[in-house]
């Protein structure tokens, strides 16, 4: 199986399955001398881990990360950073009834046709359990980017039909939904409680923002920064759409509305989402992710078995009724990994570039 590594100068390779003994990651390319601790990584892992509220899966994983290499006396050495998270709460027997069936809208059917073999326990490699390692690796990238003045934060901007207006960043960390509007939390809780009673699931929209990014990151033509972000964010389980800036709303805009005009004081808008011609403009980089409703629900669904016979499938086990609730730190991690990679690439080729034009912010 290929496709387990992302990046060119800052690379992240992950391995492990949902019900295997552990998840592992190798992070290469981190500059030496970065102060890093287990707490730096654990902070984001705790934001993602399961079982933290009644609105997420009740699988109880501590997600305690171990640093195996690449860090000595609290500082990165420049060598490969090895990371490990042990799985501790697998209940593989929950999946024995579906080992010869294909769950609708899961990767069971496609993995079977591609490999001829599949780990049916919790989806194996296709499970979102893998994203714990992305969050751990992304925490390293976030720590380095922060030292360069770059801050990456995300929030839930929609759950099912409920749109969530942005109010404050402080509110995001004070509820289980990563909602920036505390007044919306009771409505979100009531909606999720009813959803659970209906034995159904729902999708969500996540917004992730990077502030403090200097102009110049991104490599035309095929490694445009927005293309790389879309690639990385689309690689997250259940993501079915990515928008940069105004995204699909630009279809209804006129050029006079959409263009981000410049003044000596700064940009007048940010419809481009901080990226022009595939290169960062110095404005905040803004991306939106659409996550589908999980198909792991107890309502029966039609499918087939490995012999092609029709069956009704009821998915047992412990699942998120809305995978978007825990997706915010994952989206932050993937944006951080992309920006870290491009920062190092930009520095390698363009470190000596100097222009007299001032860097503009947004009014």
Curated annotation (Swiss-Prot):
Cofactor note: Reduced FMN (FMNH(2)).
EC numbers for this chain: 4.2.3.5
Keywords, in A-Z order: Amino-acid biosynthesis, Aromatic amino acid biosynthesis, FAD, Flavoprotein, FMN, Lyase, NADP
Cofactor annotation: FMNH2
Presence of the UniProt keyword Ion transport in the record: no
Top-rank lineage group of the source organism: Bacteria
Catalytic activity: 5-O-(1-carboxyvinyl)-3-phosphoshikimate = chorismate + phosphate
Ligand binding (FMN): 125-127, 237-238, 277, 292-296, 318
Residues that hold NADP(+) according to the record: 48, 54
Pathway: Metabolic intermediate biosynthesis; chorismate biosynthesis; chorismate from D-erythrose 4-phosphate and phosphoenolpyruvate: step 7/7
Entry's Gene Ontology molecular function annotations: chorismate synthase activity; FMN binding
GO biological process: amino acid biosynthetic process; aromatic amino acid family biosynthetic process; chorismate biosynthetic process
One GO term describing the cellular component: cytosol
Stored InterPro entries: Chorismate_synth, Chorismate_synth_AroC_sf, Chorismate_synthase_CS
Pfam families: Chorismate_synt
Self-association and partners: Homotetramer.
HAMAP family xref list: Chorismate_synth
Family to which this protein belongs: Belongs to the chorismate synthase family.
Entry function: This reaction introduces a second double bond into the aromatic ring system.
Protein name, per record: Chorismate synthase
Organism for this UniProt entry: Pseudomonas fluorescens (strain Pf0-1)
């Amino acid at each position: 199986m290929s496709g387990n590594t992302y990046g060119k100068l800052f690379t992240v390779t992950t391995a492990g399955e949902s019900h295997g003994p552990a998840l592992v990651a190798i992070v290469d390319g981190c500059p030496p001398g970065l102060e890093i601790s287990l707490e730096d990584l654990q902070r984001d892992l705790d934001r993602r881990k399961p079982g933290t509220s009644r609105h997420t899966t009740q699988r109880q994983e501590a997600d305690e990360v171990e640093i195996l290499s690449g860090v000595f006396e609290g500082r990165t050495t420049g060598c490969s950073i090895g990371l490990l998270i042990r799985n501790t709460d697998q209940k593989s027997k929950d999946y024995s009834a579906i080992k010869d069936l294909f769950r609708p809208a899961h990767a069971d059917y496609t993995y079977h046709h591609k490999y001829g073999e599949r780990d049916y326990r919790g989806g194996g490699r296709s499970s979102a359990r893998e994203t714990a390692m992305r969050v751990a690796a992304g925490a390293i990238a976030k720590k380095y980017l922060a030292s360069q003045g770059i801050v990456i934060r995300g929030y839930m901007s929609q759950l099912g039909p409920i749109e969530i207006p942005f109010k404050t960043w402080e509110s995001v960390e004070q509820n289980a939904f990563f909602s920036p509007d505390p007044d919306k939390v009771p409505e979100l809780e009531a909606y999720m409680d009813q959803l659970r009673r209906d034995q159904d699931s729902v999708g969500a929209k996540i917004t992730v923002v990077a502030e403090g990014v200097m102009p110049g990151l991104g490599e035309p033509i095929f490694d445009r920064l927005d293309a790389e972000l879309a690639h990385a964010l689309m690689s997250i389980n259940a993501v079915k759409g990515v928008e940069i800036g105004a995204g699909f709303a630009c279809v209804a805009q006129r050029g006079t509305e959409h263009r981000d005009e410049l003044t000596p004081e700064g940009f007048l808008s940010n419809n481009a989402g901080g990226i022009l011609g595939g290169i960062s403009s110095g404005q905040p980089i803004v991306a939106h992710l659409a996550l589908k409703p999980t198909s792991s629900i107890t309502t029966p669904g039609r499918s087939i078995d490995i012999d092609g016979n029709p069956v009704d499938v009821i998915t047992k086990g412990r699942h998120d009724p809305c995978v978007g609730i825990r997706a915010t730190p994952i989206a932050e991690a993937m944006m951080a990994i992309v920006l870290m990679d491009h920062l190092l690439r930009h520095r390698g080729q363009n470190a000596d570039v100097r222009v007299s034009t001032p860097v503009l912010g947004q009014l």
